[in-house]
Amino acid sequence: MAQDVIANGGTPEIGNLATPINSSPFTRTFINALPIYRRGLSSNRRGLEIGMAHGFLLYGPFSILGPLRNTETAGSAGLLATVGLVVILTVCLSLYGNAGSGPSAAESTVTTPNPPQELFTKEGWSEFTSGFILGGLGGAFFAFYLASTPYVQPLVKIAAGVWSVH
């Protein structure tokens, strides 16, 4: 007897299909543990966690791979570039939340059966955006501080040497 690999996960017309990847327990647990879908978080806290991750992770590529990578100001340039991008992302989030009637309501899918409804209102999105900029700037400054400590500085020099052109 043949077994279907892809099952209908709701409305097939919009592509909500249950595949072995998106309906596996591992994938569902992983996706639902992310701050955007985790239960019990306020919109501001969601933005704070997501912004912190973005600010922290964007600092490294800007400081190590940026145009000033082989200078003494590589760390400062990376910090300023990260702050600039976080501000641009915050403006984009704010524009998205204020355009039209606000962010569209999240629909339940196979992977995320209970999306947070309070986030997808104008007020919730505004709180998310304010948390995002605070977390993003905090993450960037923390990464800058961490990369300038004497314990991490040798690792920064190794990483900069890997991607430098001599």
From Swiss-Prot:
Stored Gene3D superfamilies: Photosystem I PsaL, reaction centre subunit XI
Taxonomic superkingdom: Bacteria
Subcellular location: Cellular thylakoid membrane
UniProt entry keywords in alphabetical sequence: Membrane, Photosynthesis, Photosystem I, Thylakoid, Transmembrane, Transmembrane helix
Membrane-spanning segments: 77-97, 128-148
GO BP term (any one): photosynthesis
Family matches, as SUPFAM superfamilies: Photosystem I reaction center subunit XI, PsaL
Cited Pfam families: PsaL
Membrane topology: Multi-pass membrane protein
GO cellular component, one term: plasma membrane-derived thylakoid membrane
PANTHER family: PHOTOSYSTEM I REACTION CENTER SUBUNIT XI, CHLOROPLASTIC (PTHR34803:SF2)
Family that this chain belongs to: Belongs to the PsaL family.
Name of the featured protein: Photosystem I reaction center subunit XI
Lineage: Bacteria, Bacillati, Cyanobacteriota, Cyanophyceae, Synechococcales
